[in-house]
Amino acid sequence: MIRTIQRQSATRFSSALVQRRLYSLASDSLNKQRKPQEEGRLARIFKDPSNKAWKDLTAPQKAYRTSANIGNFSIVIFGGGVFGLIIYALVTSIWKGEAHYGDEAFELLKANEECRYVFGDHMKALGEATHPLRRTHGILTSRVWDHHGVEHLVLQFHLIGNERKGHVFGRLVNVQGDYKWEYLFVDVANYGKIIIFDHTNSVRQQHKNFGLWGSLKNITWGN
């Protein structure tokens, strides 16, 4: 009886060892350190050690280092070119773009005598809302072409001051790449149009300016 129990316990112990050994072999296979792969022939030929001087490099290594330097230099040049184009576009849009003419129009309005009388010396320019949910405003500009193919730049914005509000209209013509003013006026609610200048006579022909006391008069202010 004792021998039977010993045999059974020995069998169980040996089976447990086998199971444990199987699991240990699986874990050992996962934890074994992989041998580094041997480099190929081309890798050994073109490998460029960074600690080697130029004179110590072989011809293929010199070619590899030269091509790498040229590639890095090309990336730097390309990035600098893109950055330069962005800066050029920003500068030209500020100094020669549409925003420049909006500022110029506002300065002309502030210098006009009738505009100062109607809107006061502390008049403000307010552009059109770019989005219903945004508070930022910008001058509304558009480019149009007439039947002769000539380009025109049209701008609009609001002028406020002395509890009055006016709608400013301006138009410029493209003359060999340079924009020239055609007309600039502001339409004031319950007052009429204040014409700053009209080189085309298109606005003045339709304009009937009301005097200060409501009488119909053709009065020129600040011209």
Swiss-Prot record:
Where are the membrane-spanning stretches? 75-95
Question: A GO biological process this protein is involved in?
Answer: intracellular protein transport
**Keyword Nucleus carried by entry:** no
Which keywords does this Swiss-Prot/TrEMBL entry list? Membrane, Mitochondrion, Mitochondrion inner membrane, Protein transport, Transit peptide, Translocation, Transmembrane, Transmembrane helix, Transport
Instruction: List where this protein forms a coiled coil.
Output: none
Cellular compartment(s): Mitochondrion inner membrane
Transit peptide range per the UniProt entry:
1-23
Q: Name one GO cellular component term.
A: mitochondrion
> Which superkingdom, per the lineage?
Eukaryota
* Purpose of the protein: Essential component of the TIM23 complex, a complex that mediates the translocation of transit peptide-containing proteins across the mitochondrial inner membrane. Required to keep the TOM and the TIM23 complexes in close contact. At some point, it is released from the TOM23 complex to allow protein translocation into the mitochondrial matrix.
Subunit arrangement? Component of the TIM23 complex, at least composed of tim23, tim17, tim50 and tim21.
- Which family is annotated? Belongs to the TIM21 family.
Protein name, per record:
Mitochondrial import inner membrane translocase subunit tim21
Organism from which the protein derives: Schizosaccharomyces pombe (strain 972 / ATCC 24843) (Fission yeast)
